[in-house]
Each structure stands twice: as C-alpha cells, then as structure tokens.
C-alpha cells in the first residue's frame, strides 16, 4: 500500500491526492497494489502490451498483468498501460467492470499473494491517469524495483531464520 501512497504523493494530481491519500492515514488503510509486470518472457516495463485507448473523457484498458501482489484483496490498483505517447499509469478501483483477478500461481512467496490480473475493456475516467504532465514513468518503475528488492531481502531473511535452527538441530 505504501508504494501506491508514495506514487500518489509524488505524481498524483490535487484531485487524485484529495480523493485517495487521506484514506492511507486511516486506522484501516485501503489494500492497494501496483500492476506493471506482464506474463511474457524477458518482460520490459518500457514496452507494455497492456493498452489504454482514449475514448472521450475516459480510457479503455485491455491486457494482462502478472505477479500482482495482494490482487485478490486490493481496493485500489495502479496499472501501467501503453498509450499513444508512451507508458502511463492509471488508478483503477477494485471491482471495476472488466477487471478480473486470476488464481494464485506463485510458488514460494505466498505472503505477497501474487495473482494475475486481466483487464477486459476496463473503462477509467481520464482524470484517473496518474500525473499532470509531470509523470516520470522510469522513476515509477525504479521505485517498484526497490519494492521487489525489499521483498526478496525479506524472503532471504526468512530462509535464514528457518534454515539456521534446522541445520543446528541436525
């Protein structure tokens, strides 16, 4: 959830910040996640296959995401998609029509509850596109990479915590 709050703080418009940021300070903040990864080999976050097509005062998103943490429980998604002028990120509320969460295929890192996400003609208001022309997609991806690194470090620590006593008892 904090990655989403950080992205909204850094790039969200005043309207987006007013609508979503205060909920992260509540006793029970919303479960929120970022969906960038796509299910293909050698995934490049700068060459997205998920598309967002402008349609009047909204965008229509189509595509698939993989390894989306907390996807089944998320109330708020930041979804990366390709638009005419390059990659963009959209704020999508959980339960939106056309947004489907798949089964949990993850082996090992079950604590993050990673699941695939399918977007089938998901309509999003144009005001839910992150940023006001100042959005830096590369920096957004870099922050997401840091989150993945912290997940990997935590997993390695859990392995050490488990293996140390096991080896000592053998």
Which positions does each model-derived feature cover?
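A short, Trp-centered hydrophobic/proline-enriched beta-strand micro-motif
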Residues: 27-39
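Short, solvent-exposed loop/turn elements at beta->coil junctions and helix N-caps
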Residues: 37-41, 66-67, 104-107
